[in-house]
């Protein structure tokens, strides 16, 4: 069924190499790999959408996870102590408070704009979420991608931008200063990939 459905299309594009491999195995044809739609917009368009005023008035590090663990929260407390930054923890389920400490502040069930605002104005971002990682790159925020090389979407993005060193294993959150890659180089790579993707999309959709 999937093979017949895919073969009915004149052109196919996917976002990750792993997905391209899967489609090629089924159809015998290699699809075009295009960058994620979030990267097709200019950075300034995202900045205008988010706004320049932070919703958190003090310096902070942002931790986002659907299922944060007590071990991760303990590491965040140690990192907060080393850096002097308060931890802003946001999660989509919002049914718990793992640790009650003044240095951890919970922002539960934030909307899309608030989520992007938290990323844009953070001193440091820690997450396993693709969108947290991609917007950290867009806004040039230092970050770590938890288990990043095990996630198809995140690993493809990190490989594309040559930022694999930002991937960390769960429960091994590093110091923010232990890995500093050049965001300008990453953005230049993204610009080239964007131009290539736009050429394909314009051709395929005509």
Regions found by a protein language model. Name each.
Residues 1-206:
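Active-site anion-handling motifs in enzyme catalytic cores
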